Amino acid sequence: MYTQNEVFEPVEVVAHFHNLKIDILRFKWKNDIFKVNEILNIWKIPFGESFNTHFIAVCKDSDMICELSFNHTDMKWELIQYDTLC
């Protein structure tokens, strides 16, 4: 059963930036820490004169799949939506 939850809430992210690539390690949302095990997809959406990069992330320990967005202008992260893996 598909139970998508749209939230559009800010999150704190620990990521590794290298060679124009962003590797998300984990993020904090509502005082919970979510370890990112895998990134399934990445795409960019124009936003003003810059763009936002969106990621589909799998958090196996939390049984969650989610969409995260990174705004390259203000360097802020947002949790767009999430769902359970099962």
Say what each PLM segment does.
Residues 1-86:
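N- and C-terminal low-complexity/disordered segments
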